[in-house]
Amino acid sequence: MSISSLHRGYQVLRTLLHYGLDELLAKDKRPKLFPLIRGCFFWIRNQHKDKSAAERLKLAMQELGPVYIKLGQMLSTRRDLLDDEWAYQLAMLQDRVPPFDSALAREAIETELNASIDSLFDDFDDVPLASASIAQVHSATLKSNGKAVVLKVLRPNVEALILADLQLMSHCAALLERILGDGNRLRPAEVIEDYRLTILGELNLKLEALNAIKLRNNFLDSDALYVPYIYEDLSFTRLIVMERIYGIAVSDLSALKAQGTNLKLLAERGVELFFTQVFRDNFFHADMHPGNIFISRDHPDNPYYIGLDCGIMGTLTDVDKRYLAENFLAFFNRDYQRIAQLHLESGWVSEHTDIVAFEQAIKIVCEPMFNKPLAEISFGHVLLALFRTARQFNMVVQPQLVLLQKTLLYIEGLGRQLYPQLDLWQTAKPFLEQWMAKQVGPKALFDKFKSNAPFWAEKLPELPELVYDNLKLGRKLLGTQQQMLDKYLKYQHKAHKSNYLLITSAVFVICGTILFTQAVTLWASLLCLGTGAGLWLLGWQARPKNRKL
């Protein structure tokens, strides 16, 4: 481990002790060496005893910097793992850091472009439009067409810093998991691995560009979502150049009302967009927090969303989509047995799970939700309740569904912020029913046959040979089975003969012994004993020699 890694480790440890996070471990869970380690840093005391544990964790992550801030933000969406107070505190973490030097930004941009900024852009603004932990954004005008663009560039050395912190996190998570044991609900190693995959994906701006292009193409003819144009020839791993957009932040409700935006239509379109991305395209924006969503300034009576930052996208398998659709439909039909069966059929809970107990646990959690009108029931909280219940029965974690549940909570919160009377069920029900109809109807059967047709067309010429080989193998197996049966019968015959002779010999020996002890004629006794000995010898020789069939 390098000196810098040791120094960073000390910084993290000092911060954890400063906020008293070591006290979160129950005394019976603390390692034996814990008091000794704590004593070595006796001068670092908990300076925030007046604050709750959740608030202290939030402050510690804020102090530790961008990588930990992003981890906290991700944890705030894992409500299947955290209680509401912890999730609420971590959700308040802000990924805002001072901008880095514009000279470094220029150097990084020119390195990626292999050209000077002045040769490609006019009016490059050294003052960034936004600055975050991974990248910052500058505005400019393209020389080639005169259009306004923004350039998103990664921070210098950000990859090395993130990888170093991730390595330290992994070591800490492994240690914490050993301390807490397998039954712990938080599962630190799993959380850190999920976070590692997410944040490393955000470091590849070329991937973000390709995601944005795909999402834009999916909604080219849509009047509900607009994705800015990506200049693919100017986008690389550490730089992305895109069309500059002008809109109203979705969180700026007063500005939306001031321009007369149709908030009811906007809220309904948000839900429709989510289900369209999931069920039609199987490609959904999974980072739809307010900072990434804007609303058009033109046509406020027919508003549309503007989506930015496609670094985190989600996809689902057909099994996932069926699980999602059938679970929602079963929930609103109060069919808790079907919900339990779906988890079993998907292979996410063990086949040895007590299905009756699982069904009852789901019912206990879900039934109280029907005390409120259908329009007020949250899809995200339904999924959350199912995840939490299933985890009690050792459900295998499905990262793609956790990502979807997080996005669904964002969409619902956004929709009800825009229009509190939004009826999520009535808006989403047609999408779910249409998708299910496509999965089980005649057209679905024909589509599956059509998709498998190339495979069968390729295998068809091999069919006669496969049939011949199987018949040949069958005959060979039949012959082998007959040989084994003959051997078995022969073995049984010899075994029966041997047993018969040995038992008979035992009878003669017993009779001879009785005659001898009763002082009966000596010759009769010797005859019985001799006959018994002879029969025993014949029986022993008649034993099957080969016990292996």
UniProtKB/Swiss-Prot annotation:
ATP binds at L129, A130, S131, A132, S133, I134, A135, Q136, V137, K152. It is a multi-pass membrane protein. It holds the Pfam family ABC1. Keywords: ATP-binding, Cell inner membrane, Cell membrane, Kinase, Membrane, Nucleotide-binding, Transferase, Transmembrane, Transmembrane helix, Ubiquinone biosynthesis. Pathway: Cofactor biosynthesis; ubiquinone biosynthesis [regulation]. Its main location: membrane. Its EC number is 2.7.-.-. GO terms for biological process: regulation of ubiquinone biosynthetic process; ubiquinone biosynthetic process. Is probably a protein kinase regulator of UbiI activity which is involved in aerobic coenzyme Q (ubiquinone) biosynthesis. This is Probable protein kinase UbiB. It comes from Shewanella denitrificans (strain OS217 / ATCC BAA-1090 / DSM 15013).
